[in-house]
Design a protein with these regions (language model features):
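Short, acidic, metal-binding catalytic loop of nucleotide-sugar glycosyltransferases
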Residues: 19-28
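Short aromatic/hydrophobic "clamp" motif used to bind/position activated sugar donors
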Residues: 79
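Conserved nucleotide-sugar donor-binding catalytic segment
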Residues: 128-211, 215
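A conserved acidic beta->alpha catalytic loop
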Residues: 20, 34-43, 83
Length: 242
């Protein structure tokens, strides 16, 4: 499978991400797209250079563009991306791949993931649910690092939308569903989402809600009341308690 690893100034986490990829029990082609980091990221990338199918480090047009660039360079029939501050659990990719093999009509599969707070180590399960349009309209029920997509479906929808910066994954799930059919849910933990002080959904919470609501409106036709009620509370809670 083809794995894109977009990264920018995440050298302290990047080694964990790459280690988790190469510990998987399946053949992978990995492309690291670094946005011109000023930390130790390039040193980490060079450490893994002999295992990578490609990498670069220079200013780019953002995360979505980097993901599309990486996946376009690969040839494998399955694709995914792993943000450099997240990681896969042992055998996680194998479980996802097996599920797509069993269900050949599914454009993508997603499993469960943990959310780990960096400073405290607190671990909680990410809210994930079996796929249904109504559930997807109420919230993003899919955890991005716990997903695997058929390349044919990825190419059919044109990859991630480069105009989006906060909800590009949420938008992708909608487009895969609309154009290729329901995504398959795997009831097993396969990945970990790391929450830290620089996480975009933490530092840009209001913008994240606004972008996600625009995605719902675009693909579902209306924004459920739950979004309007949850937005101010979530912004306040994050600003107050972190």
């Amino acid at each position: 499978m083809t794995i894109a690893v977009p990264s920018f100034n995440q050298g302290r986490f990047l080694d964990d991400a790459l280690t988790s990829i190469f510990q998987q029990e399946i053949p992978v082609e990995v492309f690291v797209m670094d946005g011109g980091s000023s930390d130790n990221s390039v040193d980490v990338i060079r450490k893994w250079g002999h295992r990578l199918c490609g990498w670069r480090s220079h200013a780019d047009e953002g995360q979505a563009a980097a993901i599309n660039e990486a996946i376009s360079q690969g040839l494998a029939p399955y694709v995914c991306w792993l943000n450099s501050d997240d990681w896969f659990l042992p055998s996680g990719l194998r479980k996802l791949l097996d599920e797509l093999t069993i269900y050949p009509d599914a454009p993508a599969v997603y499993g469960r993931s943990w959310n780990v707070v960096q400073y405290s180590g607190k671990r909680t399960p990410v809210w994930v649910e079996p796929f249904h349009e109504r559930r997807l309209a109420l919230r993003c029920i899919i955890s991005q690092p716990a997903t695997l997509i058929r390349r044919s479906a990825w190419e059919a929808v044109g990859g991630v939308d480069g105009a989006l910066h906060m909800a590009m994954d949420y938008d992708l799930w909608w487009r895969l569903y609309r154009q290729c059919g329901p995504l398959k849910f795997l009831d097993d933990f396969v990945a970990v989402n790391r929450e830290h002080e620089a996480t975009k959904t933490k530092t840009l919470r209001r913008r994240h809600y606004q972008e996600a609501m625009s995605v719902v409106r675009k693909h579902h036709g209306s924004v459920p009341l739950k979004w309007w009620l949850a937005q101010p509370y979530a912004v306040w809670f994050k600003s107050r308690f972190g």
